[in-house]
């Protein structure tokens, strides 16, 4: 299941990386490729994501739903 979320003021898609199944935040706008911890992960120019395993506990706590409600990303990782 994919979910649109807010992280660092940007709307990203909380999903699983297609190649490994790892939870990640996928870009929704090409301008997001410059965000800290964003990685190029594919053969297409728009395949960038931030792997949740690379975020600190503080950064994980900053991921919210589109209405600003905090998300328990640790719990959500199993549902994505």
Describe each model-derived feature in a short phrase.
Residues 2-4, 26:
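Residue-level detector of beta-strand face positions
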Residues 15-66:
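Acidic, low-complexity, intrinsically disordered interaction modules
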Residues 1-2, 73-80:
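Short intrinsically disordered terminal tails
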